[in-house]
Amino acid sequence: MTSLDSAPPRLAPARPGGGRGGRLGERLLHAYTWLILLWLVLPIIVMIVFGFNDRVGKRNNTWNGFTLRWWGELFAIPDLTTALVNSLTIALLSTAVATTLGTLMGLALGRHTFRGRGGVELLMFANIAAPEVVLGASLLSLFITMGVPRGYLTILIAHIMFNISYVAVVVRARLAGFDSSVEEAARDLGAGPFTTFRLVTLPLILPGVLSGALLAFAMSIDEYVITTFNAGSTLTFPLWVFGATRVGVPPQVNVMATIIFVVGVLLALGNALLLRRRQI
Amino acid sequence: MTATGHTATGHTATGHTATGHTATGDAATGAPPAIELAGVAKDYHSRGRAVPAVSRIDLAIGPGEFFSLLGPSGCGKSTTLRMIAGFEEPTRGRILLQGRDVTAVPPNRRDVNLVFQSYALFPHLDVAGNVAFGLRRRGVKGRELRERVGTMLDLVELSELAERRPRELSGGQQQRVALARALVNRPAALLLDEPLGALDLKLRQTMQIQLKAIQREVGITFIYVTHDQGEALTMSDRIAVMNRGRVEQLASPREIYERPRTRFVAGFIGTSNLLRRTVRAVDAAGPGGRAMVVLDAGADERLSAPLHPQMGPLRTGDQVELTVRPEKIEMSATRPDGPCCALRGRIVEVVYLGTYTTYTVATHGGTEITVFWQNSTDSTNVAERGEEIWLSWLPEHSYVLPESADEEPSTPRSGGPDPGGPPEGDAPRRNGEPAAGAAAQTPTATAAHPVSP
Ligand SMILES: Nc1ncnc2c1ncn2[C@@H]1O[C@H](COP(=O)(O)OP(=O)(O)O)[C@@H](O)[C@H]1O
Ligand SMILES: [Mg+2]
C-alpha cells in the first residue's frame, strides 16, 4: 500500500522485505475488494442471466441455452402479472403520498422549533429502527381491531406509513445549511407564502425530495414482511415470487426483476447526476 | 445636507436643534414622510426571557432621502430594518409607509424592498430571473418585463452577465444583482442592510460612490444600515447613530461630526478628544447669546466651551466632559492671544501620515490630546517629541457634554444585551438625553483614549 511504500527511508534497512510485503498487501487488498464486489453482484448477474435460460422442466437453475422466449412471454402468467401491477401501483401511490407528507414533515422538523418536535423526531426514527415484523404485526392487529378488511388498501396504508419517515429523514438532511433568507427575499419581492414555497423552497429542496421519493419507491417495491401481514388475499410481486419458490420460480420473474433493477439503477444514476449538476 | 445652517469654518448657528430634522416630511406641502417609526420597540424572547433589541425608536424619513442607521454591531440596526420590511413584528409602536399604518401588513404587501446583507440571491435562477422575480409577482410580463429588467441591468452594469447563475459571479457582481433585484420594483423605499460589508475596501469605496449616484438617479428613499462611520458620512443626507437599541443622535453628517450630542457619538464617529473637567462658571449670555461654560484649568490656561444645545442647565462644580476634534486644534510655541481655549502640554508622540501628522500631547492634567496637523506647506514637523507647546482652539469648535456618571470600564464593543439587563426606559433622562447608562458606552476603536486626570 502507498503508506508502506512511502514509509521513511530510515526504516528500510530494518525491514528489507518491506517493499515486497507492501506489494503483497496491495494485491491481497485488490483481491479482497473484487471478491466482495463479486459477492454483491453475483446474485444479480445470475438473476439476469437466468432470464435468458432455455429452461427444461420446472426448475430454472441449470443453464440450458440462450433464449429470448421469456421476454416475449413476459405476461403469460396472469397471477404474476396482477401481482406485479399491484406492486407497481402500490409503490407509485405510496411514494407519491409519502413524499408529499414526508417532505412537509421534514420541512417542519428542519425549519421550525415547536412543542413536541423531539417527540415527532423520536417517533420517526423509531419507525425506521423498529423491526418490520413488529410493525407488520402491530398494524395487522390495528386493522383487525378496527375491522378493516385486509387487501390492497391496507398494503397501501402500510407502505405509506413506513415510507414517510424515510422521506422526512432525507428531506431534513437536505435542509442542513439551507439559507432561509432566500425565502425572505421572495416574500420581500411580493411572493405570498405559497408562491414562495413553489418558486423558491421547493426548487431548492427538490434534489432531497427526489432522493426521498426514490428511496421510498425502492423500499415499497420489494417490501415483504410488513406486506405479508396486511395483504389478506391480495398478492404483490415479492409475495407471489416467495410463494412460487416452492414449486419453481418461472423465468418471467427473472425478466421482471431485471427490468425493475435496471430502471432502479437508471433512476438512481439520474438523481445523482441531477444532484451534481445543481450543487446549490 | 447643507440645511444645518453653518459653514465649513464651523461657525455655529443658533437654533440648529430644529435644522437637523428638515428632511422629515414636508410640513409646507403636507406630503407625509416616506417612512415613519413611532415609538417602535422590539424584544426578542430567548429561553423565556425578553431581550430588548430595539428599546424605542422614533424616526421620520423624508421622500428621496438617503438615510443611514449607524452603530456598532448588535445595536439593533438590522432588527429596525427588518421591522420596516415586515419580517419582525414590533413589540410596541407603529410603522407608517407614506402615511399608511403597515405595522400588521406582511412583507409581500409592503412597498419597500430589502437588500440583504448576505444578498440572498435565488441560486436556481439566473441574473435576469432574479431581477425579474419581483416584477413577475406584480404581473408585469412580456416586453415591459424584458425592458425594465434590461434597463436595470444596464444601470448596474450587468447586462453581459444576464444568463449567469449567482454562484458564477464575484461578490461585487452578486451585490449589484441584489441591488438591481430590489430597485427594479421602484419601491417607496429601499432598505439596505450593510450591503457592502462583504466587499474589499477598494470595491467598497467604488460601490459607495455608485450607490449614491444610483440613488440620485432613481430618486428613491434609501435606508442604509452600516457600522462603518466613513460610509455613513460619505453617502447620507442624515444619519441616526444607534447604540443599545436607541437613537443617540439624528442629524446631518456634518452636525453629527461637529456636534456629537453624546459621549458615545463623539467616540464612535471619527476621533474625539474628551477632557473631563469641573464647571467653574456658567455664562448664560456668552458670545452670540449662547451659554458658555468655563471649566477648571491651570494658571494662564483657559478652557471654555458652549453648552451642547440639547443639554440641560449646568451648575458650578458639575463634572462634565469637553470634546474637541483633533483637526480643530492649533499648536504654538507661545501662549496664543485672543479669546481662544489654551492649554499647555508636552508632545509625547509624533506620527507622520503623509497628508497630515498626528501629535499626541500630554496636558498638565494628565489627559492625552490628539492633534491632526495638516502637512500643507512645510515638510518639517512644527514641533518635536518632548517639546513644551501650547494647544489652542476656538471655544465654538468644542462642546461640553454631560459626564457619564456610571461608566462601565469594559463594556463589550458589540453592545449586545448585557447580562444584568440594560437600563430600561424608566432611567432618569435630561432634556431628551438618553439614559446615562446608554451614553456611557465605551467609545469604539476609532476614538482617542483620553486619560482621566
Ligand atoms: N432572532 C433573534 N433572536 C434573539 N435575539 C436576536 C435575534 N436577532 C437579533 N437578536 C439580538 O438583538 C440585538 C440586535 O441585533 P441586530 O438588530 O441584528 O443588530 P445589528 O444589526 O445592529 O448588528 C443583538 O443583541 C442580537 O443578539
Ligand atoms: Mg446587522
Tell where the protein language model's regions lie, with residue ranges.
Chain B
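Non-catalytic connector elements of ABC transporters
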Residues: 2-9, 272, 282-453
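The feature captures the beta-strand-to-loop junction immediately N-terminal to the Walker
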Residues: 70-72
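Helix-to-loop junction immediately C-terminal to a conserved catalytic motif
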Residues: 85
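Conserved ABC transporter NBD signature motif
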Residues: 93-101
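ABC ATPase nucleotide-binding domains
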Residues: 107-267
